């Protein structure tokens, strides 16, 4: 019985400490994640990723290559790491 308890505590500890396993609470999420998608004021057409706080998802948008705001990621992974996971 003691071995099972130790194993359970060990597994829980690993899960809590492993990066990318927990969802951030809204108060812990960086404020940039609450900004709307902003395509900017340039003339290019680049696919970028932004965090949609209402849908709690990282979504694609067209970025013009100039201006905009900080809620602008090149990769979905970066958006998720910043706005979804610890």
Curated annotation (Swiss-Prot):
Domain BPTI/Kunitz inhibitor: 33-83
First and last residue of the signal peptide: 1-26
GO molecular function: potassium channel regulator activity; serine-type endopeptidase inhibitor activity; toxin activity
Positions of disulphide bridges: 33-83, 58-79
PTM section of the record: Contains 2 disulfide bonds instead of 3, as for all Kunitz domain proteins. A double Cys-mutant carrying an additional Cys bridge does not show difference in activity with the natural peptide. However, there are some differences in the kinetics of binding of both peptides to the channel.
GO cellular component: extracellular space
Free-text tissue specificity from the UniProt record: Expressed by the venom duct.
Threonine amide sites (modified residues): 86
SUPFAM superfamilies assigned to the protein according to its UniProt record, in alphabetical order: BPTI-like
Source species, domain of life: Eukaryota
Name by which UniProt lists this protein: Kunitz-type conkunitzin-S1
């Amino acid at each position: 019985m003691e071995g099972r308890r130790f194993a359970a505590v060990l597994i829980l500890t690993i899960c809590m400490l492993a990066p990318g396993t927990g969802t951030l609470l809204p108060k812990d999420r960086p404020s940039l994640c609450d900004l709307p998608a902003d395509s900017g004021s340039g003339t290019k057409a680049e696919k970028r990723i932004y965090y949609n706080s209402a849908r709690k998802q990282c979504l694609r948008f067209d970025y013009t290559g100039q201006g905009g705001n900080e809620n602008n990621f090149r990769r979905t992974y970066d958006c998720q790491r910043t706005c979804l996971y610890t």
